[in-house]
């Protein structure tokens, strides 16, 4: 079952769920807690490779990914990152999140932002049991105008579901967990599949 605001507050109080920095009481609503945008972004330099072969040899795939991903772009507080129509960018939450082995999280974008064409998490919105780290956001501007994104703006909401029991393989204990303990806008590691 989804956790209510009261249950989320209790989980934060007793350390079952850890969100750092801890959200204000105003950031917790009915079944979710707001998360904010961090200051790190990465973009695709699409002119550097004609394509990425997602089923090709892992070495070639990684080389193509390395050619097309920018280094981390740091945006200071008060300044803006501009996401243009049709562009995809990676970013990271301001908050770091730690979940136990019996709770799964879900990240939803804000309706107000979606109405402007901003997709906050293109497909991967599940936060696995045992997750620890910041959450990478996959932004896509499907609108007609550039969008200014500023560090610490509210960008989405996390909600949580308690499972019937702890999972046998929490994310933070899996040897093949590609994004374990991520603290920055990590690019795709599909070549490690």
Swiss-Prot record:
Residues 174-193 are annotated as: Disordered. The keyword Repeat does not apply. Catalyzes the deamination of dCTP to dUTP. It catalyses: dCTP + H2O + H(+) = dUTP + NH4(+). This is dCTP deaminase. It comes from Shewanella sp. (strain W3-18-1). Pathway: Pyrimidine metabolism; dUMP biosynthesis; dUMP from dCTP (dUTP route): step 1/2. HAMAP family: dCTP_deaminase. It comes from the Bacteria. GO terms for molecular function: dCTP deaminase activity; nucleotide binding. The keyword Membrane does not apply. The gene is dcd. Belongs to the dCTP deaminase family. DCTP binds at residues 110-115, 128, 136-138, 171, 178, 182. Its EC number is 3.5.4.13. It holds the Pfam family DCD. Homotrimer. Keywords: Hydrolase, Nucleotide metabolism, Nucleotide-binding. The active site is at residue 138.
């Amino acid at each position: 079952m989804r956790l209510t605001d009261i249950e989320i507050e209790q989980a934060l109080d007793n350390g079952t769920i850890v969100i750092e920095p801890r959200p204000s009481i105003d950031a917790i609503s009915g079944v979710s807690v707001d998360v904010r945008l961090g200051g790190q972004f990465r973009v695709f330099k699409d002119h550097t490779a004609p394509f990425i072969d997602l089923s090709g040899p892992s070495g070639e795939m990684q080389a193509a990914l390395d050619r097309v991903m920018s280094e981390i772009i740091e945006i200071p507080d008060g300044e803006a990152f501009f996401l243009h129509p049709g562009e995809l960018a990676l970013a990271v939450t301001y908050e770091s999140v730690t979940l136990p082995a019996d709770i799964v999280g879900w990240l939803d974008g804000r309706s107000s932002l979606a109405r402007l064409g901003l997709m906050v998490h293109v497909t991967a919105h599940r936060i696995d049991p045992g997750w620890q780290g910041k959450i990478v956001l996959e932004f896509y501007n499907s609108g007609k105008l550039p969008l200014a994104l500023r560090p610490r703006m509210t960008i989405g909401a996390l909600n949580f579901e308690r499972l019937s029991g702890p999972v046998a393989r929490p994310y933070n204990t899996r040897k093949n967990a590609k994004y374990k303990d991520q603290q920055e806008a990590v690019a795709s590691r599909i070549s490690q599949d």
